[in-house]
């Protein structure tokens, strides 16, 4: 049987995600971000709600990406997620993309010339941002051009790099309907961005979300809910360079900007430069919010939920892969668990995220 991996945020889960799961074959394993997203923002609803949405709509097994995999630039996010899925035995990786290319060929190219390609990136001027350097590399070696508004295509290339040299086939699916950042309501498939923006529009949600009741019952948060706490973390820390990935230049800019910024968005605007993209700045602010430090990734994989089919697969992995299904006195990953505690501060109604929580079981698919 085919074992298909899907890397996702489901922020929130919508019909486009359901379409992706429907297109996937065999046993479907999702490696999903926890409570903080790749672009450096809190998830609109918590990881358990999003895992349940996925399991109700075609996923067989949902595992959690640790915080230091979830909140990373595309390459590191892709690498960390593929590492986890590879250990769970996938032989195919399905993903949505704005531009269906021969990603397998691109992965083979990276297998062959990876060292040379990375050297090329290292020699590019530091005035370029990391995404610009990566795009220059793909243009040079694979003749790829970028239109600028194709975040899924950029992630797909990160997945191609991550599967290079592994026995995993890439299976791109053409993204349906609205673009990633689109807030357009008049489409067949709405984007997660549009759903977050129109979260109070009942008819809109019902049109584009398969598990709308779960979404409506869940506590919802936005970055601004954490702004007072972020502000406190910045003001009370005498040396921001002790935080993961924060350099001297960024520390100075953030300290200066917090004097006048009245919101997270304003702070991001003030700190962003040509070299430091908004997404990168948001990630740095997320690290500051968590007081994140460089940390070893957990050996074990945290299981958020499964169907009967997923449970059977986990049983077959026993003894080969270290799995965590309940977090007790011993932490699974201290950094992720700290992030979850801070996530809970966003709204008093958010349920406990770890202790006593057991995987969600969905009996029928």
Curated annotation (Swiss-Prot):
Enzyme Commission designation: 6.3.4.-
Protein's UniProt keywords contain RNA-binding: yes
Entry function: Catalyzes the formation of N(4)-acetylcytidine (ac(4)C) at the wobble position of elongator tRNA(Met), using acetate and ATP as substrates. First activates an acetate ion to form acetyladenylate (Ac-AMP) and then transfers the acetyl group to tRNA to form ac(4)C34.
Protein name: tRNA(Met) cytidine acetate ligase
Organism the protein comes from: Streptococcus pneumoniae (strain Taiwan19F-14)
Cytoplasm among keywords: yes
Binding site for ATP: 7-20, 96, 152, 175
Annotated Gene Ontology cellular component terms: cytoplasm
């Amino acid at each position: 049987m085919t074992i298909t991996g899907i890397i996702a945020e489901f922020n929130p889960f919508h019909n486009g995600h359901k379409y992706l799961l429907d297109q996937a074959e065999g046993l479907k394993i999702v490696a999903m971000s926890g409570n903080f997203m790749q672009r450096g923002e809190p998830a609109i609803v918590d990881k358990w709600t999003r895992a349940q949405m996925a399991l109700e709509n075609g996923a067989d097994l949902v595992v959690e990406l640790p915080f230091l995999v979830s909140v990373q630039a595309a390459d590191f996010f892709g690498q960390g997620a593929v590492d986890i899925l590879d250990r769970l035995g996938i032989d195919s990786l399905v993903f949505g993309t704005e531009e269906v290319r021969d990603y397998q060929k691109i992965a083979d190219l990276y297998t062959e010339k990876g060292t040379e390609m990375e050297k090329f990136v290292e020699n590019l001027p530091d005035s370029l941002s990391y995404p610009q350097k990566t795009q220059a590399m793909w243009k040079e070696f694979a003749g790829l051009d970028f239109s600028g508004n194709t975040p899924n295509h950029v992630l797909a290339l990160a997945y191609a790099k991550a599967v290079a040299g592994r026995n995993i086939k890439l299976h791109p699916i053409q993204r349906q309907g609205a673009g990633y950042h689109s807030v357009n309501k008049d489409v067949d498939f709405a984007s997660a961005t549009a759903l977050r923006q129109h979260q109070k529009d009942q008819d809109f949600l019902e049109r584009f979300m398969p598990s709308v009741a779960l979404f409506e019952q869940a506590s919802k948060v936005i970055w601004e809910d954490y702004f007072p706490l972020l502000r406190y973390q910045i003001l009370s820390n005498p040396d921001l360079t002790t935080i993961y990935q924060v350099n001297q230049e960024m520390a100075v800019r953030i300290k200066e900007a917090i004097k006048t910024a009245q919101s997270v968005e304003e702070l991001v605007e003030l700190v962003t430069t040509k070299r430091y993209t908004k997404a990168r700045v948001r990630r740095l602010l997320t690290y500051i919010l968590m007081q994140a430090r460089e940390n070893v990734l957990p050996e074990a994989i945290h299981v958020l939920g499964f169907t009967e089919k997923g449970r059977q697969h986990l049983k077959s992995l026993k003894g080969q892969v270290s799995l965590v299904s309940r977090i007790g006195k011993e932490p699974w990953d201290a950094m992720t668990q700290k992030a979850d505690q801070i996530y809970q501060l966003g709204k008093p109604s958010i349920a406990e995220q770890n202790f006593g929580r057991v995987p969600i079981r969905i009996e029928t698919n």
